[in-house]
Amino acid sequence: MIKQALISVSDKTGIVDFAKSLSDLGVKLLSTGGTAKLLADAGLPVTEVADYTGFPEMLDGRVKTLHPKVHGGILARRDLPEHMQALEAHDIPTIDLLVVNLYPFVATIAKDDCTLADAIENIDIGGPTMLRSAAKNHRDVTVIVDPADYAVVLDEMKANGNTVGYATNFRLATKVFAHTAQYDGAITNYLTSLTDELKHGSRNPYPATLNMAFEKVQDLRYGENPHQSAAFYRDIVTPAGALANYRQLQGKELSYNNIADSDAAWECVKTFDAPACVIIKHANPCGVAVGNDSADAYAKAFQTDPTSAFGGIIAFNREVDEAAAQAVAKQFVEVLIAPSFTDAAKQVFAAKQNVRLLEIALGEGHNAFDLKRVGGGLLVQSLDAKNVQPHELRVVTKRHPTPKEMDDLLFAWRVAKYVKSNAIVFCGNGMTLGVGAGQMSRVDSARIASIKAQNAGLTLAGSAVASDAFFPFRDGLDVVVAAGATCVIQPGGSVRDDEVIAAADEHNIAMILTGVRHFRH
């Protein structure tokens, strides 16, 4: 039974109402510093920990709760007579409920003006110590680190005579250990990232020890293949526009491949300002287009490769209305993603309950790192977030691109970034015309992209081509020109750049170098 609670929080969300409810249930309240003042100002009967222990707060608040009368009351096992006799001998009441959250270390180091001294002062000592003590003794002590759990604990106390069951206590304890591990991990990441221990700003983005924490969203039916087990995890702090924040409106449970392909589709479609549609198959765009609205963009994207679009993942960067829904509903689709769906659009898909509809807010989608596991290790890199600006482009041919060609080139370049290497993308009039992906030679990707366009009945005459990396020889360029391309955008950087540029001049096409490569593996 909960008779006494100790409350000490940095995040004071909902704490007054929670403490009042505890007091109404007859629970004695102990508290520290600012929390105690807040509760007292609200008219609640609260005892300061300093008065409770008979030992004042000291060292500018660094020592508040590190006292046997606090930790003895938390750690004593109620089922061991010798523990309870020791408490009685030293006049230590039990503390049955601990409500603590920690100094905002992560928020502090995120500030531009944060100094190392600021960071150090926001490393909580007493809080984690109490939390770990209570979590260790969870059979007898209820511990809350998250304000979201206030209501759950109160409801259980009211229903069970101020008692919280073991299952809830165990869940709350595991939450504490996860929280303190993340907290210590953030401190380690920060301190080991400092290149000059005297300067907060001198930080290596890749700390000597990398700690990362994720929380499980769900177990998956299987992994990439049926014989593989799998689960989906998300970052503890998830950017607003991240796929992991999806809201599923209808459809079957998402699979491992659904999630992976949906992320590729969503990240690609968000890069466009105009209404856009991206169709993904096996993590590669097989159709991308911009249009007047979602329905128009979808119609153009679907034209690129109707065969590959079968069973694909489709993403929009605008609301899906009835017209777009009716167009998509004519095809077999695994997942449809958009910022929102009109009621009429939802009604269209109500007759196709296997189609998974996902709503995700537009916005930044990824945290700082891109990760790839290798045997016994982890490759960590910054995101490929580079978008070339017009002033960074360099025309290297005698003929310059026309304004229309420039628009097509920039569109093609944006798409190529999301195609598996080696990538060749033909585009024109705001849509992909042919996509060559994932080939070991660039010339083969060029040939495949050309064949894809022919199979779809699309002309490549006057088209623009993007290559995610340089042309090592002129052969790839010759293939795209023979197919009908009149302008090319590529990074450059080959030892044979002069030969490739000369070939472009020979064909009288325009060529732009970006100086940026977009390998994608």
From Swiss-Prot:
Pathway: Purine metabolism; IMP biosynthesis via de novo pathway; 5-formamido-1-(5-phospho-D-ribosyl)imidazole-4-carboxamide from 5-amino-1-(5-phospho-D-ribosyl)imidazole-4-carboxamide (10-formyl THF route): step 1/1; Purine metabolism; IMP biosynthesis via de novo pathway; IMP from 5-formamido-1-(5-phospho-D-ribosyl)imidazole-4-carboxamide: step 1/1. It catalyses: (6R)-10-formyltetrahydrofolate + 5-amino-1-(5-phospho-beta-D-ribosyl)imidazole-4-carboxamide = 5-formamido-1-(5-phospho-D-ribosyl)imidazole-4-carboxamide + (6S)-5,6,7,8-tetrahydrofolate; IMP + H2O = 5-formamido-1-(5-phospho-D-ribosyl)imidazole-4-carboxamide. Its EC number is 2.1.2.3, 3.5.4.10. Pfam families: AICARFT_IMPCHas, MGS. It comes from the Bacteria. Keywords: Hydrolase, Multifunctional enzyme, Purine biosynthesis, Transferase. GO terms for cellular component: cytosol. One of its GO terms (molecular function) is IMP cyclohydrolase activity. SMART domains: AICARFT_IMPCHas (SM00798), MGS (SM00851). GO terms for biological process: 'de novo' IMP biosynthetic process. HAMAP family: PurH. Belongs to the PurH family. The IMP cyclohydrolase activity resides in the N-terminal region. This is Bifunctional purine biosynthesis protein PurH. The lineage of its organism: Bacteria, Pseudomonadati, Pseudomonadota, Betaproteobacteria, Burkholderiales. The gene is purH.
